[in-house]
């Protein structure tokens, strides 16, 4: 991934024409100067996250016009839905509880530029309180706002349907006041994904039905099956779900933290994804998951498995059992990270597509980033792999040199020294890996997405 010496990446010696002291302003700088923030919380969220997003966009090859478009969407549409700062409600979409996560997707074939994505759970001041204990109000509010933005091909109908089918209702929230459910500290019920593609933003929805399943004493697989049956007339048959359900039922593969995803497009065109997790982080389990216990045997599946094992070895992932019980790892609470995967299902297709998520949160960033750099170069993406380590260091400056902020001040200090990756283990969060004949390797890297790094003292001790 090449660091551009353009508006997004200005060296200290690169100065504006006719000015011997002022650096060229970035897209982030321009928006920071011109935007009127409703309150100090929004301003701090922008300062702590916006410049990182600008850097990621630039390094992924987004030209200034595309970066301006993406950052304008972020500052105008998403920033108002991040709620109070510092965040009080802990979101299930990240290990730290942060309600957003930036990632970059790479595709081996097709000469496709990287795509920057944002995982996002909208939050408000009432999130997690008695007013909105399961953070459901901001999700509907953001969905309503997206509907009036005229995003090409955006269709909220599946999101609204699954919100009703998969998330706790008023009666169930009353029962939850009286009945403690294991894992219920993960109270998130739904979230969004935004792919910042060249021609339009692509929107995905996520639901987290685990609490509703457990409360109603239903198995996750049967619960999902019942929820998609009413859609059959509108969407068509989904035979791949039967294969997925058979494998997961036979191997006790439905985790209590399983969740669901879909594209916010015409339901007949949407992909459906079933996510699960496992605490046994060993290659033999990965191979079983990838092939659905031997049910998927095509040459393409086997080719993908070879690449998957190569990346597994290059990242030097620690193998063994990880005691994940649904908690967070945010500098206060510490829990290990499990393996996660999803099965992508399309209307009328007999076989699902497996996507595996490497549990790299808590692993050496140096090993992970070094392994990723080698892998990108080996699969023909050397224009990103050759400079990947330098690019990530540029994203994530040395947190230990950041000044302690006053109330409502930004702590961002992007001129501070680059972070020593050999001493960190949580700058990178996940690597997702899929493989198809059309795309070849389809890989995404997820990053801790704020200049606040809550694990600094923990990692200095270790």
Swiss-Prot record:
This protein's pathway: Alkaloid biosynthesis
Site location (Required for regioselectivity): 119
GO molecular function: prenyltransferase activity
EC number: 2.5.1.-
Record flagged with keyword Transferase: yes
Similarity comment: family membership: Belongs to the tryptophan dimethylallyltransferase family.
Protein name per UniProt: Prenyltransferase phqI
UniProt: brevianamide F binding residues: 101
Record-linked CDD domains: PT-DMATS_CymD (cd13929)
